[in-house]
C-alpha cells in the first residue's frame, strides 16, 4: 500500500500550523466573572489550553482587549498573559473587534485565512467579528469549549 504524498500545509483545506491563526478576544476579568453558561475555572483552563497549543504549534496569535485604555477596564486575565508572554495586547473601544483597524491589520499581517477564534461573549464579541471575517473571505473556527456568553442561549450562534 502506498502512502499519499505529503500535504501542503499552507494550501491544505484542513487546519494546519501553517495556514491558521488564533484570535483571542476580551478574556478580561469583568467578562469572565459575568458568564453563567460555564464554570469560570473550566473556561479559564480551556482558553489557557488553547493558548498553550497555539504556542506549541507556533501559530500567530492576535490578542485583543476592550476599553482598557479608554475606561480603565482590566487587561487580559493573568492566567492567559502568563502563557502569552511577549504577545502584545491590542486594545479597542468597539465591541466588534473587526471594526478596529489595528486588530484587522494584525489579523491580515498573519497571512492566514483560517482563523481559530475565541471571544467573550459569544453573542457579541465572537459573533460580530466572525461574521465580518467570513464576509471578507476568511474561514472562522470558534473553539466552542473556550467561548461562552452571558446566558445559556449563547450556543445559538454556534
Which residue stretches match the model-derived regions?
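Short coil/turn segments at beta-strand junctions that form active-site/ligand-binding loops
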Residues: 19, 59, 111-114, 138
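Active-site acidic carboxylates
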Residues: 1-94, 142, 156-157
